[in-house]
UniProtKB/Swiss-Prot annotation:
Species: Malassezia restricta (strain ATCC 96810 / NBRC 103918 / CBS 7877) (Seborrheic dermatitis infection agent)
Compartment(s) of residence: Secreted
Active site: residue positions: S205 (nucleophile), D352, H386
Family indicated by similarity: Belongs to the AB hydrolase superfamily. Lipase family. Class Lip subfamily.
Cited Pfam families: LIP
Protein name: Secreted triacylglycerol lipase LIP3
Name of the coding gene: LIP3
Length: 469
């Protein structure tokens, strides 16, 4: 769940500014996951252990950003995993990217924000060379971050953590699939990775759902993983409050996507809601199942999912016993036995206009009360909107990764830090991030900030054009 239209604008600016960049060589067109037989598991897969590789292949990766990014090799892995419950077997795919200067004992699980339900939005498809142009500009934009992490020498594993049904916002499913993507990557013999490989998980916005739940579930689900840290921000830690916050607002399309994801993962919810949806509601869920973020946000701004036009007795959507039971299991930090064991760096803008700050802070505090070592950084500056925060805070994320990978000590217990703007932190310059900070400033100058006002303005313009037409 993220403000996206300004990111599309930013991506276009990148492309216009880099017309001299290397042109990617053409190769065969990849197929979307719903049409590619690679994604169909072989017989007997249900009996395998989670994290087991079912098949793998080499792929060509193209980063649709400033310039072609060099990498040594890339693979896709189909692996056995679990849905929301461990006894619900499923499969999904992760994309593994190995940099030229790969450090064979360091791995980053990068849970990119997909925030949509369409098959062609899956990272394993979008990341491939010659995937449909700009099928998901949001993911294409986030690949700007990939190059920075790859430059550190860290191998990346990027899972399709929403699974074959693309169950966006089904946090427990996403957590399991992210963890099993790590296990599958460690099991890929071509990489020669040790079981003691140091692993860090990262995610922002919709990607932080997968990362936050992976951090919560890993100690019991895959306790032997050598997790040395988790870092995530803009976190929808409480799905109920997030849906209520999104509802009726500019990014309301993400609420529609979230409802579709929950319906598609939980049969009890599907059985309850399907005969209550209006024609408009059914059409909305069908639409998001076929489209990616930009199309969804443009199609459903200001939509009220709690209205009678969406479903009969719409106000009951989030308050019915069935929905409350399911949504109650999707709140981070509630159960003491689901507390991250590895160090956590969590960050959130105080003025985040998309994801409620309070819910994220509450989850972090509860984790701390349950024994987690967690630094929660609150950004108070007026330029810190939901979308701008991820990019502006990239230096601190990289610093956290470097320190965890090198074994430096971390805080004990819970600590709350207040910062105006991360790029104004003297530590960013002192740690050698001055060049990266300048690049970030130049990239977002006059494009984001002030509550991501540009994103809101563009959606309002789109809405007016639709009314006129």
């Amino acid at each position: 769940m993220v403000s996206l239209l300004w990111k599309f604008t930013l991506l276009c600016l990148f492309l216009l500014a880099c017309t001299s960049a290397e042109v990617l060589e053409r190769s065969s067109k990849p197929q979307t996951p719903d049409k590619d037989p690679f994604y169909d598991p072989p017989s007997g897969w249900e009996e395998k252990e989670h994290g087991t590789i079912l098949r793998s292949r080499k792929v060509d990766i193209a980063f649709f950003q400033i310039a072609k990014v060099k990498y040594k090799e890339a693979y896709e892995i189909l692996y056995r995993t679990s849905r929301s419950e461990e006894d619900q077997p499923s499969t999904t795919v992760t994309t593994v990217i190995v940099p030229e200067n790969a450090k064979k004992d360091k791995l980053v699980n990068m849970n990119v924000y997909v925030d949509s339900n369409g098959a062609r939005c899956a990272p394993s498809y979008v990341l491939q060379r010659n995937a449909k142009l700009a099928t998901d500009p949001a993911l294409s934009y986030q690949q700007v971050l990939f190059s920075t992490i790859l430059d550190e020498g860290y191998i990346l594993t990027v899972p399709d953590y929403q699974g074959p049904k693309r169950a966006f916002a089904a946090g427990r499913l996403e957590g399991h699939m992210a963890i099993d993507g790590i296990l599958a990557t460690l099991n890929l013999k071509e990489l020669c990775l040790s079981k003691d490989t140091k692993v860090i998980g990262y995610g922002y916005s919709g990607g932080s759902i997968a990362t936050g739940w992976a951090a919560s579930l890993q100690p019991s689900y895959a306790p032997n993983l050598n997790m040395v840290g988790w870092t995530f921000g803009g976190t929808p830690a409480n799905l109920t409050s997030t849906l209520e916050h999104l509802n009726g607002g500019t990014p309301a399309g993400f609420a529609v996507s979230g409802v579709a994801g929950i319906v598609d993962e939980y049969e009890s919810v599907a059985d309850w809601i399907n005969d209550k949806l209006t024609h408009k509601g059914k059409h909305a869920l069908d639409f998001v199942r076929e489209h990616c973020t930009v199309g969804i946000v443009l199609r459903y701004p200001f939509t009220n999912i709690l209205s009678d036009s969406f479903m009969k007795h719409g106000a009951q959507l989030l308050q019915s016993p069935i929905m409350k039971k399911v949504l109650g299991t999707l709140n981070m930090g509630v159960r003491p036995d689901e507390t991250p064991k590895a160090p956590v760096y969590m960050f959130h803008a105080k003025l985040d206009e998309v994801i409620p700050y309070g819910s994220a802070h509450d989850a972090a505090k509860r984790w701390g009360d349950h024994g987690a070592d967690i630094l929660f950084e609150e950004f108070t500056g007026l330029v810190m909107g939901h979308a701008s925060t991820e990019l502006l805070n990239l230096p601190n994320v990289l610093l956290f990764m470097r320190d965890r990978m090198s074994g430096k000590p971390f805080i004990h217990g819970y600590e709350h830090k207040h910062t105006d703007n991360p790029l104004e932190d003297p530590g960013v310059i002192a740690k050698g991030f001055d060049a990266l900070a300048e690049t970030i400033k130049n990239a977002i100058d006059n494009t984001v900030g002030m509550g991501d006002k540009h994103m809101k303005a563009k959606i309002e313009q789109s809405r007016r054009r639709r009314i006129v037409s």
